[in-house]
Regions:
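Walker A/P-loop NTP-binding motif
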Residues: 29-41, 51-66, 82, 86-92, ...
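The conserved Walker
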Residues: 45-49
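Short hydrophobic/aromatic beta-strand immediately N-terminal to the Walker A/P-loop
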Residues: 42-44, 72, 178
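Conserved SAM-binding loop
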Residues: 5, 23-24, 73, 123, ...
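Conserved nucleic-acid-binding Ia/Ib motif block in the N-terminal RecA-like helicase ATPase lobe
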Residues: 11-14, 18-21, 67-135, 143-146, ...
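Post-DEXD/H (motif II) to motif III coupling segment of the RecA-like Helicase ATP-binding lobe
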Residues: 85, 140-197
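Conserved pre-motif I regulatory segment
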Residues: 1-44, 150
Length: 197
């Protein structure tokens, strides 16, 4: 499979080409076609295997097709959230132009509020800061129909389960979930039964 073979919007194909992504990695060729069908995904992938692109391509395709839809990507650390946003921005170029917001601790709240006011439809962040914005009523997740839990094993190890569950109360029941984890211990399998269809 090549990226050009994917059944995606032409704008996005062009954007992948411009970003010089050529041949899909195993995680990309396995998960992208499933995600594009709107199905939930449980993916095992280490950092550096191209998993970010594996969820970014179907996400942008979905948001291009549905102008009301939103995507939420939850990451365990601000460093990972920043890296994820860098990949998102490589594809979400000026031509595509979907509003986005990076919600992480240690960064200016004002800047984040400005990003959210500009009708951000791609939200990348850490559980703590996402919950801060929910409490402040600056983040409305009622249109989220694409949810990514990235490095889920790390999030559980760091004790984020209650925070994630709190966030998910604000996400509509009907949404697509992609759960990525480096390993698949018992607790991940449990959480996948809970969150995935």
């Amino acid at each position: 499979m090549n990226f050009s073979d994917l059944n995606i919007e032409n704008k996005l194909k062009k954007s992948i080409e411009l970003a010089e992504f050529k041949v899909p990695t195993p995680i990309q060729s396995q998960s992208i076609p499933i995600s594009l069908e709107g199905k939930d995904v449980l993916g095992t992938a280490q950092t550096g295997t191209g998993k970010t692109l594996a969820f970014t391509i179907p996400m942008i395709n979905k948001l291009l097709k549905d102008k009301q839809a939103m995507a939420l990507i939850i990451c365990p650390t601000r460093e990972l959230a920043t890296q994820v946003m860098e990949t998102v921005l490589k594809l979400n170029n000026r031509e595509i132009g979907i509003g986005n917001a990076l919600l992480i601790g240690g960064e200016s709240m004002q800047k984040q509020l400005r990003q959210l006011k500009k009708r951000a439809r791609i939200i990348v962040g850490t559980p703590g800061r996402i919950n801060d914005h929910i409490e402040r009523k600056s983040l409305n997740l009622s249109k989220v129909n694409y949810l990514v839990l990235d490095e889920t094993d790390r999030m559980l190890d760091m004790g984020f389960t209650p925070q994630i569950e709190l966030i998910l109360k604000f996400v509509p029941k009907k949404h697509q979930t992609l759960l990525f984890s480096a390993t698949l211990p018992e607790n991940i399998l449990k959480i996948s039964h809970k969150y995935l269809d």
